[in-house]
């Protein structure tokens, strides 16, 4: 199992600044407490930590790079790759994968070489295009493989599942008028966006809306299953489902002669369990890399804890990987077949989506791009090897593209977001603009005069390469200007540019952020607020996924907020009280 280092983490340099938020480091001494006690399970600072890979050697001989990892020399590759004709001589798992009937409803998705990314990363980087399937994700494979093994009696009664994502479309797809004539009942949270509800209904499924969360919907699905005698089709917790997902590994193995590593996005673990189990029996020299969003890293937490552990809050930006606890069966399957783990931040995922678009004018979903974001890490220090990233889906909510585009330019290192204070004097703005020269240019400017003592300026700068931003900050500080680099402060990206209005001239302000479902009852939310609180700032932002953010500044004593904490907890919405966020201090304090 993984061990925790007591040393401070050392951030490794990046192969490319394509994602400035993909990190590998030794876990800090308080790694476990950070997971379990933070309001956000992984706070902003946690983006700099990742579970240390336990099957890759350390190389301390690289000057200036502590703890760099180098690839273990692999065994000789298997020359004759198995086919269905050879399956009688293979273990049961491989035999079932090779004989899977999934091709009744799916196509063998292509593997494409990404020329631009390959040149930039110095490897042969391929993408497995599961976004080309009929429901625009890999989620047809597992459900159909399981349902095709059901008896006629079970098919006649119908099936049921709970989902708010791609699985909800994968289960009903083969039904009415298609391969399996069966009724599908899909239980979905009431907070599910209409675009997904409409998509599932269009496939002929009976949609049941229940609860505010996936867990509540899942509980109700179990009750309906027992009541109506339906067969449950789980999204990942079944051997037949995992074998269906394993057909992706079989295809990759046939499509590329030599594969050094496969980067797999992980939610509940069905995809990684299926792909990893296949490769470790056929090509054990191929490294299988888990890629998780750092605010939804249920597998990383469980591996570190050496048992399945549940995240208290889960970020929904990469909604296809939004799972609070890794599956029991999938976690057990992955223990001996996963080689490394990488955690990626949201702006890194956004940068990966942009790279896929630049490469072939295709837009993939956030969880689907996680595997590509994981490749940006400097962890491997390898050249000319064959790497594969699985693009698991393309069911992107159009509204979310706005947030993705904001994060992408910052995550890719093409732009930087700076905040600064200036004396409120005539000509200071012109002086500031004169500090920007050479290859740097403005893409957005927000300026507000607040007093003769101070004015606020927020700059979005276009830059190439990234190192110019450090020179820019040094130059501004040398000129006597206070500068904050808030490029990777997600709150600043979402809200900060809209808060440049100056101080409210009140004391004891406290900054609070709530994460609420997109369809949450706003009246219920406001009723719990204390009548003694003076609300000095309020901003609501729908982010186009399963959540929206409410940013508030409250003029109140902190002790009263602590007293009211139980009532806030009763709402069931994640929140964070923060008096020290740089964007908050820049925008609303004097």
UniProtKB/Swiss-Prot annotation:
Compartments, as annotated in UniProt: Plastid, Chloroplast
Domain of life: Eukaryota
Record keywords: Allosteric enzyme, Amino-acid biosynthesis, Branched-chain amino acid biosynthesis, Chloroplast, Isoleucine biosynthesis, Lyase, Plastid, Pyridoxal phosphate, Repeat, Transit peptide
Pathway field: Amino-acid biosynthesis; L-isoleucine biosynthesis; 2-oxobutanoate from L-threonine: step 1/1
Coiled-coil blocks: none
Pfam families in the cross-refs: PALP, Thr_dehydrat_C
Positions bearing N6-(pyridoxal phosphate)lysine: 139
Activity regulation, short description: Allosterically inhibited by isoleucine.
Catalytic activity: L-threonine = 2-oxobutanoate + NH4(+)
InterPro entries: ACT-like_dom_sf (IPR045865), Ser/Thr_Dehydratase (IPR050147), TD_ACT-like (IPR001721), TD_ACT-like_sf (IPR038110), Thr_deHydtase_biosynth (IPR005787), TrpB-like_PALP (IPR001926), TrpB-like_PALP_sf (IPR036052)
Top-level EC class: lyase
Keyword check for Plastid: yes
GO-annotated biological processes: isoleucine biosynthetic process; L-serine catabolic process; threonine catabolic process
Gene Ontology CC annotation, any one: chloroplast
Transit peptide per record: 1-44
EC number per UniProt: 4.3.1.19
Entry cofactors: pyridoxal 5'-phosphate
Molecular function GO labels: L-serine ammonia-lyase activity; threonine deaminase activity
Tissues in which the protein is found: Found at higher levels in flowers than in other organs.
Domain spans labelled ACT-like: 416-488, 509-580
PANTHER family: THREONINE DEHYDRATASE 2 BIOSYNTHETIC, CHLOROPLASTIC, THREONINE DEHYDRATASE, MITOCHONDRIAL-RELATED
Family membership: Belongs to the serine/threonine dehydratase family.
Listed name of the protein: Threonine dehydratase biosynthetic, chloroplastic
